[in-house]
Curated annotation (Swiss-Prot):
Ca(2+) binds at E285, N287, I289, E292, N303, D304. It comes from Mus musculus. GO terms for molecular function: (1->3)-beta-D-glucan binding; D-mannose binding; metal ion binding; polysaccharide binding. The chain crosses the membrane at residues 53-73. One of its GO terms (cellular component) is external side of plasma membrane. The keyword Nucleotide-binding does not apply. This is CD209 antigen-like protein B. In vitro, is a receptor for HIV-1, HIV-2 and SIV, but does not transmit virus to permissive T-cells under the conditions tested. Expressed in skin, spleen and lung, probably in a subset of dendritic cells. Detected in spleen extrafollicular paracortical areas including the red pulp and marginal zones, and at lower levels, in the follicular area. Detected in skin suprabasal areas adjacent to the epidermis and in epidermal cell layer. InterPro entries: C-type_lectin-like, C-type_lectin-like/link_sf, C-type_lectin/snaclec_domain, C-type_lectin_CS, CD209-like_CTLD, CTDL_fold. It comes from the Eukaryota. It holds the Pfam family Lectin_C. Disulfide bonds join C195-C206, C223-C315, C294-C307. Probable pathogen-recognition receptor. May mediate the endocytosis of pathogens which are subsequently degraded in lysosomal compartments. May recognize in a calcium-dependent manner high mannose N-linked oligosaccharides in a variety of pathogen antigens. Is a receptor for ICAM3, probably by binding to mannose-like carbohydrates.
């Protein structure tokens, strides 16, 4: 995932044909299967003398919020500096979106509490799913990530506080709103998820960082149970990422050992340790003091340790490719 394609995003107010361009992909509200009866271009021009467009504006805003998160997911594949810049742009757009939503939804008296409760439930589920689509970034991206999550929470709060005051008294219209929300949530569920929840994406792979501790053999088994392997390192960038992440937790098992033959280091897939990774051993390691046959991330490098000791571990498996259509 090292391609340098830059994510490009147009301001919401200046988009033509209701489209967003991201990393060479075109996201079109008009071409989507989610088609509110009123277009996005009505946002700036619709006034209070039509009830339905106001509600469809709400749906459009929700859909745009979803698109912003898809854009955020796309720009996560770009280098760190560019990724951070694009995330900051998305945060600004999302802030403006929240402000616009607040000013567009009128406050008046509404009825039909049963249908409003169903709509509220759909909004809450939609918001939860949107938040689940945000990749978990490390280091410098954490603050911007928190801001985006905060903006979405504020957006949900505004929606829930005003859902009871929608100027829609016709039961059939409220039913249409409910069906639109159900359809939006269904479409959102279909969005590609590269990694399972609680896993971290990097360079086309998914990584699971354990919260409990096991001995080396049990860690190998734990990874197999989730159709993964105790982590095998294939690049310097991957090594740096894993070393930094594990350093904060403490000694962490990797999928390397010399259990089969002393001083012959093999990964769990049977491949030998490349000479270019020898530089990652801590000073004086491996020293095989007391039959230390399994390798851990320790401090700033690698250390051989006793396999029966309990430590954290990292599982790795290939990310699920997104299918088109």
């Amino acid at each position: 995932m090292s391609d340098s394609t830059e994510a490009k995003m147009q301001p919401l107010s200046s988009m033509d044909d209701d489209e967003l361009m991201v990393s060479g992909s075109r996201y079109s509200i008009k071409s989507s299967r989610l088609r509110p009866n009123s277009g996005i271009k009505c946002l700036a021009g619709c006034s209070g003398h039509s009830q339905v467009p106001l509600v469809l504006q709400l749906l459009s805003f929700l859909f745009l919020a979803g698109l912003l998160l898809i854009i955020l997911f796309q720009v996560s594949k770009t280098p760190n500096t560019e990724r951070q810049k694009e995330q900051e742009k998305i945060l600004q757009e999302l802030t403006q979106l929240t402000d616009e939503l607040t000013s567009r939804i009128p406050i008046s008296q509404g009825k039909n509490e049963s249908m409003q409760a169903k709509i509220t439930e759909q909004l809450m589920q939609l918001k939860t799913e949107l938040l689940s689509r945000i990749p978990i970034f490390q280091g410098q991206n954490e603050s911007i990530q928190e801001k985006i999550s905060e903006q979405l929470m504020q957006l949900k709060a505004e929606l829930l506080s005003k859902i009871s005051s929608f100027p829609v008294k016709d039961d059939s219209k409220q039913e249409k709103i409910y069906q639109q929300l159900v359809q939006m949530k269904t479409e959102l569920f279909r969005l590609c998820r590269l990694c399972p929840w609680d896993w971290t994406f990097l360079l086309g792979n998914c990584y699971f960082f354990s919260k409990s501790q096991r001995n080396w053999n049990d860690a190998v088994t734990a990874c197999k149970e989730v159709k993964a392997q105790l982590v095998i390192i294939n690049s310097d960038e991957e090594q740096t990422f894993l070393q930094q992440t594990s350093k904060a937790k403490g000694p962490t098992w990797m999928g390397l050992s010399d259990l089969k033959k002393e001083a012959t280091w093999l990964w769990v897939d049977g491949s030998t340790l490349s000479s270019r990774f020898q530089k990652y051993w801590n000073r004086g390691e491996p020293n095989n003091i007391g039959e230390e046959d399994c390798v851990e991330f320790a401090g700033d490098g690698w250390n051989d340790s006793k396999c029966e000791l309990k430590k954290f571990w990292i599982c790795k498996k290939s990310a699920t490719p997104c299918t088109e259509g």
